[in-house]
């Protein structure tokens, strides 16, 4: 998944950025509209008490499970804005990912010249005005970062705030729970001495069992994958009385951007989780945009099992680059 998604400000948002210091507005709550632009969802009018105004901001945020960017204007901050990135824990994972990956683009829209400090929140308790002010005051004592360091830090922090903590053993990527049927299928696969195939999918923020097949020859594995939806799969191959386990990740170019982002960001967490919880060690990997790449030769080569007919070639373990436009 790329480190940032480029979205554009709407006319309403651009107008706010031009006029916020000269109009009676305390804060603007910004949402991502149609997954292609930043738009002003709500504006909170300014009163004599910034703390009172922030209570209204908090009420607006807690009334929805949708993540949001909040720009707060404090007259005492030399016309600068305070940025609050709010990603509630119960938000949809796809929305969390979208906001996390677009935060750097949001900062560029506002421009660093207009931003004073930034703050991340994911729970109602973290939206307490006094706690936010305390956190922001600590940031003032830290050395300033270069712009590339700032964007990297912001992205990492926003990704961290979007993590679902259902399985603490997941250590990399976006953590998702694995349902019991998927865990049982993987456990059975580990002890199998046959050519068995387990295919997983992500449904409603949970990694679930899509298909479980027994005695599937390597030449037939590719036929079980979708041409439009991503999938994770584990395939066992008998070897000297035990089995080799191959990890297969197919992410078709036809899949939606959201699905590709979700699968890409949860892959490492899945592998970490099954290793920690089930003791499954992966003996080889095939990752591709096209299930047609999962040939018998590639499977045997990836698993380190020699084939009498295998040619000297390199296993496909990555995704193809988009083809350049044809020259006219």
Swiss-Prot record:
The modification Phosphoserine is found at residue 143. It comes from the Eukaryota. It is found in: Cytoplasm, Cytoskeleton. Residues 1-137, 173-304 form the ADF-H domain. The keyword S-adenosyl-L-methionine does not apply. One of its GO terms (molecular function) is protein sequestering activity. Keywords: Actin-binding, Cytoplasm, Cytoskeleton, Phosphoprotein, Repeat. Residues 302-328 are annotated as: Disordered. InterPro entries: ADF-H, ADF-H/Gelsolin-like_dom_sf, Twinfilin. GO terms for cellular component: actin cortical patch; actin filament; cell division site; cell tip; cytoplasm; mating projection tip. It holds the Pfam family Cofilin_ADF. Residues 306-318 have a biased composition (Polar residues). GO terms for biological process: actin filament depolymerization; barbed-end actin filament capping; conjugation with cellular fusion; mating projection actin fusion focus assembly. Interacts with G-actin; ADP-actin form. Belongs to the actin-binding proteins ADF family. Twinfilin subfamily. Actin-binding protein involved in motile and morphological processes. Inhibits actin polymerization, likely by sequestering G-actin. Prevents actin filament assembly by forming a 1:1 complex with actin monomers, and inhibits the nucleotide exchange reaction of actin monomers. This is Twinfilin. The gene is twf1.
């Amino acid at each position: 998944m790329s480190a940032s998604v480029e979205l554009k400000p709407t006319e309403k948002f651009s107008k706010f950025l031009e006029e916020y210091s000269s109009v009676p507005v305390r804060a603007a709550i910004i949402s991502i509209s149609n997954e292609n632009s930043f738009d002003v969802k709500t504006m909170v009018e300014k009163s004599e008490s910034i703390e009172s105004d922030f209570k209204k901001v908090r009420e607006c945020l807690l009334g929805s499970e949708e993540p949001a960017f909040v720009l707060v204007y404090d007259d005492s901050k030399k016309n600068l804005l305070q940025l609050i990135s709010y990603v509630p824990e119960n938000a949809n994972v796809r929305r969390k990912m979208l906001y996390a990956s677009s935060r750097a683009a949001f900062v560029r829209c506002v421009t660093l010249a207009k931003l004073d400090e930034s703050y991340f929140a994911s729970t109602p308790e973290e939206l307490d005005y006094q706690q936010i002010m305390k956190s922001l005051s600590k940031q003032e004592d830290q050395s300033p970062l270069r712009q590339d360091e700032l964007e990297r830090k912001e992205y990492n922090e926003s990704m961290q705030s979007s993590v679902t903590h259902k399985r603490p053993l997941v250590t990399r990527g976006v953590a998702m729970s694995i349902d019991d049927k998927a865990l049982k299928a993987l456990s059975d696969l580990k002890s199998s001495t046959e050519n068995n195939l387990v295919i997983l999918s992500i449904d409603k923020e949970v990694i679930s069992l899509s298909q479980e097949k027994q005695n599937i020859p390597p030449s037939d594995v590719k036929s079980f994958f979708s041409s439009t939806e991503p999938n994770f799969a584990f395939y066992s191959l008998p070897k000297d009385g035990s089995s080799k386990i191959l990890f297969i990740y197919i992410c078709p170019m036809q899949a939606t951007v959201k699905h590709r982002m979700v699968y890409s960001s949860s892959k490492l967490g899945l592998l970490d989780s099954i290793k920690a919880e089930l003791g499954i060690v992966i003996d080889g990997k095939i990752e591709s945009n096209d299930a047609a790449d999962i040939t018998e030769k590639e499977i045997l080569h990836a698993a380190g099992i020699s084939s009498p007919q295998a040619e000297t070639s390199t296993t496909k373990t990555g995704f193809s680059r988009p083809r350049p436009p044809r020259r006219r």
